[in-house]
Design a protein with these regions (language model features):
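Short, active-site-adjacent cap segments at secondary-structure transitions
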Residues: 13-16, 88, 115-116
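Phosphate-binding loop/pocket of nucleotide- and phosphate-handling active sites
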Residues: 29, 44-48, 90-132
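Active-site/ligand-binding loops adjacent to catalytic centers
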Residues: 2-83, 121-132
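Substrate-binding/catalytic subdomain of NAD(P)-dependent oxidoreductase enzymes
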Residues: 80-92
């Protein structure tokens, strides 16, 4: 296929993966706000009208990897993204590293700004520096 849609979800609350596998939903606590809410939103159509899968894969991202990437985006790229943006970029980089994806265009979405997360784990290091 020339286009693949890959979902991203918290490793600790993989409800999309569970739904795709026909398993009961077992959501769990995680720190990636805005994702893995314990249900699959009604507007996320996992299959098209013909019954073919639209989401071909789901990449699970840990809390630590999502936070680390969001911090890295701020520090190295000047992009103040939220934790879910960190998760999406982390997943996109992992997908891009695969040999079969060499030379392919990988696109992701920065779906949140980090401004609303300045009081969370995302900005712990920055707050500690300012406090000292």
């Amino acid at each position: 296929a020339s286009f693949r849609a890959i979902a991203v979800e918290p490793k600790d609350s993989p409800v999309i993966s569970q739904t795709l596998a026909g398993e009961p939903l077992k959501p769990g606590p995680h720190k990636i706000q805005g994702t893995g809410a314990g249900f699959v939103p009604g507007n996320l159509h996992l299959k098209n009208a013909a019954g073919a899968e639209q989401i071909t894969e789901c990449v699970k991202v840990s809390n630590d990897d999502a936070v680390a990437m969001a911090r890295r985006l701020a520090k190295e790229e000047g992009i103040l993204g939220g934790i879910s943006t960190g998760a999406n970029v982390h997943a996109a980089i992992e997908v891009a590293k695969r040999p079969e994806n060499a030379g392919k265009l990988i696109v992701t979405i920065g779906c949140s700004t980090g401004e609303r997360y300045l009081s969370t784990i995302l900005a712990d290091e920055a707050r500690a520096k300012v406090s000292n």
